[in-house]
A protein has these predicted regions:
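Short recognition helix of helix-turn-helix/winged-helix DNA-binding domains
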Residues: 1-44, 74, 88-102
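Winged helix-turn-helix DNA-binding recognition segment
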Residues: 25-86
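Alpha-helical hairpin
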Residues: 10-11, 48, 118
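Charged low-complexity intrinsically disordered patches
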Residues: 58, 62, 82-131
Length: 131
C-alpha cells in the first residue's frame, strides 16, 4: 500500500495510520481475504486506544470514506476507495502542506462535509486564495 505524503500534512498521524490501514484492508478484501476482525484487533494493529480509534471511525464515516456494517456481533469496516482516491486528488491539487491542513480542517472538521461534496471549483478557488 503506497502512502500519499499529502495525507501527513492534512491529517493527524493517527488519522493517517487509520486511513492507510483501512485502505490496505480493502485491498486484502478485494483479493478474497476475510477481513472481519474485532475492534480490539484493529486497535492493537494500529497501536491506538479506543477513544482515538472511535474518533477516526467517526471522522472518516462523516467524510464518506468509511462505512460500518454490523456482522456477527462485530463491525465490518468498509473503506470507500473512490472517495479516498478523490481525497488524494484534492490534496495533490492543493499541494502546499499548510494549505491542505487548513482546507481539510475547514471542510471536514468545521463544515463536516463529505469528500464527494467538495467540488473541483472549491479546490481551485481555495488554491488561488491561499498561495
Amino acid at each position: 500500500m503506497k502512502c500519499f505524503t499529502g495525507l501527513v500534512g492534512a491529517f493527524t498521524p493517527e488519522e493517517v495510520i487509520f486511513m492507510l490501514y483501512m485502505a490496505d484492508r480493502t485491498r486484502l478484501r478485494e483479493k478474497g481475504y476475510d477481513t472481519l476482525r474485532s475492534k480490539r484487533y484493529y486497535m492493537e494493529n494500529m497501536e491506538m486506544g479506543s477513544r482515538i480509534f472511535d474518533k477516526c471511525v467517526e471522522k472518516t464515516t462523516r467524510m464518506g470514506l468509511l462505512e460500518r456494517v454490523p456482522v456477527s456481533g462485530m463491525y465490518d469496516y468498509l473503506w470507500h476507495m473512490d472517495s479516498y482516491n478523490r481525497l488524494v486528488g484534492i490534496l495533490a491539487e492543493l499541494g502546499n502542506p499548510f494549505s491542505t491542513r487548513a482546507f481539510c480542517h475547514r471542510m471536514f472538521d468545521v463544515e463536516k462535509r463529505t469528500v464527494a461534496s467538495v467540488s473541483d471549483e472549491e479546490v481551485s478557488q481555495w488554491k488561488e486564495r491561499h498561495r
